[in-house]
């Protein structure tokens, strides 16, 4: 009986370790993708391993996505720390809906607004590009943000105000 109890404890510990490993892999695994933005410029995630990179997976019809997008946090961070700032940060907007199109991103009927005007960072979505990128991530709904660190690890992070959000970037393991 004594050994059966010890074996049971060991099996429980192994099972728990395996479950936690699967959760960690789903939440924080490295994603590698190449996609064209709506201007047909190609982006390869492997070119951004030297900086923190935010991937915002949203949908053109999503109200909470629109509220986050128009809140200005990503634009401010991109301006201050992106390619035209300190160049230590990159942002990608991904319209994960397979029906995404240039006209929908420009605010056509069926979209909650014009995603293009005032957006300085790449918008990936039309022609299935956004859905293809989104398929590399495990997420439960829109909007979802992933922060790639220099190591390629991309944990899901919360939407927040600029400096709290920047703290996540600073804590990003490089």
Where is each model-derived feature located?
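Conserved redox-active cysteine motifs that mediate thiol-disulfide chemistry
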Residues: 57-75, 100
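Thiol-based oxidoreductase modules, predominantly thioredoxin-like and allied folds used
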Residues: 84-104, 116-130
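Short, internal strand/loop/helix patches
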Residues: 107-142, 146-147
């Amino acid at each position: 009986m004594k050994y059966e109890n010890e074996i049971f404890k060991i099996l429980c510990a192994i099972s728990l370790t395996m479950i936690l490993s699967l959760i960690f892999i789903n939440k924080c695994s490295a994603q590698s993708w190449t996609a064209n933005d709506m201007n047909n410029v190609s982006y390869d995630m492997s070119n951004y391993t030297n900086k923190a990179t935010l991937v915002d997976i949203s949908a053109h019809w999503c109200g909470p996505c629109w509220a986050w997008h128009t809140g200005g946090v990503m634009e401010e961070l991109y301006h201050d720390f992106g390619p035209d700032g300190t160049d230590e940060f990159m942002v990608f907007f991904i319209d994960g809906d397979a029906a995404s199109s240039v006209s929908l991103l420009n605010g056509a009927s069926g979209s909650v607004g014009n995603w293009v005007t005032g957006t300085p960072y790449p918008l990936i979505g039309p022609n299935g590009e956004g859905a293809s990128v989104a398929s590399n991530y495990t997420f439960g709904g829109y909007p979802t943000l992933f922060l790639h660190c220099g190591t390629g690890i991309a944990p899901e992070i919360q939407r927040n105000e600029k400096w709290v959000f920047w703290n996540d970037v600073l804590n990003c393991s490089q």
